[in-house]
Amino acid sequence: MERNNLLEVEHLSVHIPSTAGTVQAVRDVSFAVAPGEVLALVGESGCGKSILCKSVMKLLPKRASIVSGTIRADGRDITRCSEREMRNLRGKLFSMVFQDPLTALNPTIPIGKQIAEAVTIHQKGLSKAQVQERVIELMTLVGIAHPLERAKLYPYHFSGGMRQRCVLAMALAGRPKILFADEPTTALDVTIQAQIISLIRDLQKELKFTTIYITHDLGVVANVADRVGVMYGGQIIEYGTVEEVFFEPCHPYTWALLSSLPQLGVKGQELYYITGTPPSLYNQIKGDAFAPRNEHALKIDFEQEPPFFPVSETHYAKTWLLDPRAPKLEKPEAIRDLHEKIKKMTDKGGAFHVE
């Protein structure tokens, strides 16, 4: 990892013991993010996206533990930090916006007091008037009109989109360098989703923080990300710039994800879907985790885990299809000439686009 990175994760593995066995939630994951960059981690539910990001903040469930690997953020070895040290880093070095704002907020405390608590924790020595001023500043920053009046209201007075703005204000109270956004729009309707994504993107440019999105929505990825990590079975299986992953995908799982986009469906034909189910992470996975669902699987996929093969200096994929000895396969028809297909959708006013 040669860039001047703000966050570097190397060979990280996270296990969760249970009565049914040990869940290998994250398996030998490496990635890096530069200052001001936007990384999107994309994949199906249960692939390890959220647990990976919670590992970086050391907010793992009680039984979960990092069994190998290192995490370096802003020059610090996070894996060696104590809980006391982590409490000082959470909110300042990194912060998180969770999926459901209703459960992230206390229903019995006014919004203003909840934001004020976040301010006082991360900015010691402020007077009561200064804290109040900062609360109003944050509420204004995230687009909440009439902040003086609304600071006195409770979470149930707000819509889902406005609650997510309140959560975002709390997340930004400590001026973090890294913001994790864990499915921040899943609980919202489509028009509000677009507003929240646009707001985070604008704030990221204004405040210069790094953003890591956790999502299964490829439309979000296309519109906001600089780099993409495609996850499957607890691993990143393809990593590159958003243009490389969307327009030159190399892993069969990435092919399948893109092929299943409704926007690429052909009228009168059945939409593509990925058959089978994701692997159980209780078991030791042999070979390529995607092999049982992969219509292009080779014999070696069931026997030996593939390494990362470089496609370019910034693009890597964990598939035996990139081995020089592998047969040459054409991509599925749905994702051939994907750049032109997306451009046509954009020209017609479609919501899905790559900037």
Which positions does each model-derived feature cover?
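Short catalytic/signature loops enriched in Gly
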Residues: R3-N5, A145, E149, T241-K348
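P-loop NTP-binding/switch modules centered on Walker-like glycine-rich loops
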Residues: E44, K58, F180-P184, L188, ...
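Conserved ABC transporter NBD signature motif
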Residues: S65-D77
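Conserved ABC ATPase "signature" region
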Residues: R76-D77, A129-E149, L258
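ABC ATPase NBD coupling module
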Residues: I78-S95, I121, E244-P249, L281-I285
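A short, proline-enriched helix->beta-strand linker immediately N-terminal to the Walker B motif
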Residues: A173-K177
